């Protein structure tokens, strides 16, 4: 019978990864207990062992890319812990309104200083648009610039502008931003297109800084769960908006709440408005996320599939356009890590070494996941009744 080390070495060989090797994908093991930990706890054990310094990778993103591209995660993913997590998600609503603020406290309230150091100048915490075409609508500040983007700042500006163009944003439009973050898109939409925005977030720290960054602009920031916007009543339509955007928030909604989410969006959107949903997606339907990500980064988060979204919008929306630029998230995450790593000498006064290894593992393992095309980034444009004459796609 093969030892735990021999079993892991045989698996890694399928991904062309060598223990003790010198290539970017190779790893060094500092604690022999690693092998049993990974076999017993799967991806959770692998991530926690990295945080504990039990192993190191010459290039963590390259290693994870190799492992996922070779499908090695499937060889160790089903264990008692993951089975219990799946059962828990099936029987309970892990993203209920009572738990809605958990992710805000656990992730987005870590400290604005961390995100200011890691992100672009506008503090956009979603995928940048690096593959922006060199030509486009001359009405767009970004599309008419005549060049591809090269920096994180440019990629995020291109993404913000892409969202504005896809919903046909114009002066005077009032927009609901579900999961507004630090108000990045709201500020851009107001300054570049003359819109007004209501942004909602479950993070108190995000809301405080968003209000500061958007001071003096027609932007209202609310600390509010999406289910509290325009509640269903017998009193008519309630609060409605010309358009709705939701950038990087749907991953926190949870499968059991997808119908509720789109029901709320349907009630909030005017009859001729457009709703742009920007979300990370997965190629198969699932009820839970990676156990390490669930425990340390996004509690209660889960990535939707195309099938789950399609089923959830039935009767509420017409899908006008689906745009996948998931490969751009790899580039975005690598840029975020470069910024975070460069700022670490300053940040380490507030965070310990284990946090550094956790955050590094988060950013680089996700980069590897997008590089392996395990995860996608979708921008989906929805209308309530179909755009008369058809929707014109924007890239």
Question: Where are the model-predicted features located?
Answer:
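Feature captures hydrophobic
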Residues: 1-133, 150, 154-156, 162, ...
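Conserved SAM-binding strand-loop segment of SAM-dependent methyltransferases
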Residues: 216-228
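A short glycine-rich, Lys/Arg-flanked "PGG" loop and its adjoining helix->strand segment in the class I
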Residues: 259-271
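Conserved beta-strand signature within the Rossmann-like core of class I S-adenosyl-L-methionine
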Residues: 272-279
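Conserved SAM-binding loop of SAM-dependent methyltransferases across substrates and taxa
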Residues: 184-193
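Conserved class I S-adenosyl-L-methionine
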Residues: 172-179
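Short Gly/Ser/Thr- and charged-rich N-terminal loops/segments
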Residues: 134-148, 236-238
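Substrate-binding/catalytic lobe of Class I Rossmann-like enzymes that use SAM or dcSAM, i.e.
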Residues: 280-389, 393-395
């Amino acid at each position: 019978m093969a030892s735990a080390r021999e079993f892991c070495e045989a698996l890694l060989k399928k991904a062309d990864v060598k223990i003790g090797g010198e290539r970017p994908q190779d790893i060094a093991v500092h604690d022999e207990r690693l092998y049993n930990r990974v076999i017993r706890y799967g991806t959770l054990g692998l991530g926690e062992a990295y945080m504990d310094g039990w192993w190191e990778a010459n290039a963590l993103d390259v290693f994870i890319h190799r492992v996922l591209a070779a499908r090695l995660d499937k060889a160790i993913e089903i264990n008692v812990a993951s089975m219990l997590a799946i059962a828990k998600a099936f029987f309970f609503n892990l993203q209920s309104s009572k738990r809605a603020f958990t992710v805000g406290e656990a992730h987005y309230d870590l400290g604005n200083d961390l995100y200011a150091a890691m992100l672009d100048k506008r503090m956009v915490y979603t995928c940048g648009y690096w593959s922006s075409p060199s030509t486009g609508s001359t009405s767009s500040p970004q599309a008419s610039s005549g060049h591809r983007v090269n920096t994180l700042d440019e990629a995020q500006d291109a993404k913000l502008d892409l969202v504005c163009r896809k919903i046909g944003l114009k002066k005077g439009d009032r927009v609901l931003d579900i999961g507004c973050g630090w108000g990045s898109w709201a500020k851009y939409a107001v300054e570049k297109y003359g819109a007004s925005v209501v942004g909602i977030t479950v993070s108190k720290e995000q809301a405080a800084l968003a209000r500061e960054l958007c001071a003096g602009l027609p932007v209202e920031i609310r600390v509010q769960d999406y289910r509290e916007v325009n509640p269903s009543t017998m009193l008519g339509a309630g609060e409605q908006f010309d358009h709705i955007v939701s950038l990087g928030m749907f991953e926190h909604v949870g499968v059991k709440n997808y119908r509720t989410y789109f029901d709320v969006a349907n009630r909030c959107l005017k009859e001729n408005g457009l709703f742009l949903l920007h979300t990370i997606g997965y190629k198969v339907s699932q009820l839970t996320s990676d156990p390490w990500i669930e425990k340390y980064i996004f509690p209660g988060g889960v990535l939707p599939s195309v099938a789950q979204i399609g089923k959830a919008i039935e009767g509420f929306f017409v899908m006008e356009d689906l745009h996948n630029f998931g490969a751009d998230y790899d580039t975005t995450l690598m840029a975020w890590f470069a910024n975070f790593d460069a700022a670490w000498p300053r940040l380490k006064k507030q965070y310990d070494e284990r946090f550094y290894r956790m955050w590094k593992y988060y950013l680089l393992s996700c980069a590897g996941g997008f590089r392996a095309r395990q995860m996608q980034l979708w921008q989906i444009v929805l209308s309530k009744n179909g755009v008369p004459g058809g929707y014109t796609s924007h890239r």
